[in-house]
Amino acid sequence: DAKTGDQLEQLLSTLSLAVTRFQIEPERSEVPPGDALIVCGPKSAPIGAELINRDPALTFTKAGRRWWIEHRPSGERYGSPADEDQPQNADVAYVARHRTDERVVVHIAGIHAIGSLGAVHYLTANLATLYGETDDKSFSLAVRSTYDGLDITGSELAAGPFVW
């Protein structure tokens, strides 16, 4: 997660946005004031679960010992290839932008921590295109990425973006 934070800070700096990093307490369920970029899953902090619960398109679900990103309307699921019987060096992550009044809250949650890093890789390469598709609206999507150790070797859209 530290590497994800570093890469997010670098991305935001290239957009001339000021960054103040801080760690969210594990028991926190409320979004901090102002615009925010939050990296955590629903199992690691209540704030992650709270943000995902606001999303009408995607959610996290657990079946057996595996976590999945699920498209609520269709029930289609996106699981981590790292959790398959024949594991691959790949993961899936959830990305959402919540627009509330004049605030923007971006939420990133990998099924595993490396998935969050893959989401940042995807956003770095596709931010302009993504904005062109979603304008200034709330949306969510799923990203699939491949990795070698802690280095992301590729990323692609797995589902979405779903505008809401």
Give residue ranges: language-model regions.
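Solvent-exposed alpha-helical segments and adjacent loops
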Residues: D1-W164
